[in-house]
Regions:
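All-alpha helical catalytic cores of prenyl diphosphate-utilizing isoprenoid enzymes
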Residues: 25-31, 44-56
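Non-catalytic interface/linker regions that flank or bridge core catalytic/transmembrane domains
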Residues: 1-37
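Short intrinsically disordered terminal tails
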Residues: 1, 191-192
Length: 192
């Protein structure tokens, strides 16, 4: 089954507004390809529109965890902002592999690394410097470390541990929301 574009776009726009984004910022995301990008190269929702669907799923999970655990974010928009923009760098991370693509509805992607670093740090940079959206320390660190300790070693692991000590509940909730979305809600789905 394919992702229902019209419903998905309306849901995403509503959540982006709940994140405190204005219409110009949402238009910029549209221009970047936020509503068309895949969520991954080949794992979960590796189809056009997968990124926005994954972001909706993460936001839904993060808002539910925020309510259930009575988490204290710096502002009511925070879980929406973090959930919807945690992977924004992926608008530039996956490029259609024209040599491997035979079906436009199920393209193959190649990875394009970011000059800003890993996708957590790169998403923070894009949100703050390119979209010019202000993030609180909690929001920035939740986006930066939404992958948890996966693949970390050395100084980066120490940095994660330091952030985790500062905002343990918010970082763990964001990581959990991302993992539940990718590995439960989207399990085995290239598309919906």
């Amino acid at each position: 089954m394919k992702i229902k574009k019209q419903t998905q776009s309306k849901n995403a726009e509503q959540l982006l507004k709940m994140a405190g984004l204005d219409s110009d910022t949402i238009a910029e995301l549209e221009f970047w390809g936020y509503f068309r990008a895949p969520a991954s190269k080949g794992r979960h929702l590796a189809v056009p529109g997968g990124l926005v669907q994954h972001s909706i799923n993460v936001t839904t999970r993060l808002v539910a965890l925020t309510k259930a655990l009575r988490l204290k974010w710096p502002r009511p928009e925070s879980p929406y902002l973090v959930g919807m923009l945690h992977d924004v760098v992926k608008v530039r991370s996956y490029i259609v592999d024209k040599t491997a693509t035979t079906d436009a509805s199920a393209p193959k992607y190649i990875y394009a690394p970011s000059v800003y670093g890993g996708h957590g740090a790169a998403s923070v940079m894009m949100v703050t410097s390119e979209l010019q959206v202000s993030l609180s320390p909690e929001e920035a660190l939740a986006i930066r470390w939404h992958m948890g300790a996966f693949g970390l070693a050395g100084d980066e692991l120490k940095e994660y541990d330091c952030a985790l000590k500062a905002f343990p509940a918010l970082l763990i909730a964001t990581h959990t929301a991302d993992m539940l979305a990718a590995n439960v809600d989207e399990r085995g789905q290239r598309g919906m």
